[in-house]
């Protein structure tokens, strides 16, 4: 009996020791704890996730780090996921990036390149047969926006409208949040909106399904230059992993397979290294327009 009591006590002590030791979290970049790379839903979500998954696999093949891709439900969702530690890498549009940097310390590593440039413009589009020929004609019309966190599909066009004497909060009969640039173009094409804001030239993204879109939908006005969107990392992301992923992405962008995936995601032609200061001029433009990033980040 004494022997059994000793064995039982030993077993209990061992069990308590095991339960008392917290399990070590799986290492980041493993199947059990993958690196999450999140994309904003600025275009066709199915195409974005298809291209994103290809890019994630290529990163894994080059670095050995397990990377999983997803698409946010909206623009803000990606930013907030990074702030909550639920996403580690964000392909953030410009406005979303400067807000995420201010609010959560998210830091840019790469800027996208299109048409040989690291900047782009937004535009306001209308149907060719709408009779709208100048910005003033938009008063009393239905306006289509992408998302309140979209740089070229909301923020910058609103600044342009205000500079031309149009109050985007009061002068439209109705406003619609379409959710993506593709949806804005389609809504204007179908006559669901009289005008829409999007990047230049978002019409190309829907040309496969709407081959006459550039005849039916025309550009009314173009915004000032905007710095391109980013590949950004969370504040505490390990530097060694970040360096590996950045180098892998630069190699991917230089390969034929990688270029095809980048085109699928956001019509990206290349990637370049960037620092946060690249976006200072954009911040200055926002401040001039009365948009205070520090206040928005509170």
Question: Where are each of the predicted segments found?
Answer:
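Short beta-strand->loop
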Residues: 107-117, 171-174, 208-225
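Short, low-complexity disordered leader/linker segments with a strong preference
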Residues: 1-32, 297-298
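Extracellular/periplasmic catalytic domains that process cell-envelope and extracellular macromolecules
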Residues: 83, 101, 116-119, 136-137, ...
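An extracytoplasmic/periplasmic, membrane-proximal ligand-sensing/linker region
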Residues: 30-60, 226, 232-233, 237-298
């Amino acid at each position: 009996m004494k022997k059994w009591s000793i064995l039982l006590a030993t077993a209990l002590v061992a069990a308590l020791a095991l339960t008392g030791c917290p399990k070590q979290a799986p290492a980041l970049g493993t199947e059990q704890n993958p690196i999450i790379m999140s994309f904003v839903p600025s275009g066709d979500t199915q195409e974005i996730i298809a291209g994103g998954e290809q890019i994630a696999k290529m990163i894994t093949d080059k670095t050995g780090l397990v990377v999983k891709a997803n698409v946010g439900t909206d623009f803000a969702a990606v930013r907030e996921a990074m702030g909550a530690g639920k996403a580690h890498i964000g392909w953030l549009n410009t406005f979303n990036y400067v807000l995420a940097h201010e609010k959560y310390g998210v830091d840019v590593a790469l800027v996208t390149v299109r048409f040989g440039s690291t900047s782009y413009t937004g535009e306001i589009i209308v149907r060719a047969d709408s009779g709208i020929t100048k910005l003033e004609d938009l008063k009393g019309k239905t306006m289509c926006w992408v998302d309140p966190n979209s740089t070229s599909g909301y923020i910058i066009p609103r600044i342009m409208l205000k500079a031309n004497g149009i109050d985007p909060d009061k002068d439209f009969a109705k406003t619609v949040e379409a959710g993506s640039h593709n949806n804005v173009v389609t809504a204007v094409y179908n006559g669901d909106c009289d005008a829409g804001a999007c990047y230049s030239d978002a019409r190309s993204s829907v040309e496969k399904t709407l081959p006459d879109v550039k005849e039916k939908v025309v550009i009314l006005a173009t915004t000032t230059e905007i710095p391109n969107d980013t590949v950004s990392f969370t504040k505490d992301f390990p530097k060694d992993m970040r360096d590996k992923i950045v180098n892998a992405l630069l190699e991917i962008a230089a390969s034929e397979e990688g270029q095809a995936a980048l085109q699928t995601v956001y019509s990206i032609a290349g990637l370049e290294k960037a620092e946060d200061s690249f976006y200072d001029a954009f911040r200055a433009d926002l401040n001039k327009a009365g948009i205070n990033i520090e206040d928005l980040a509170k």
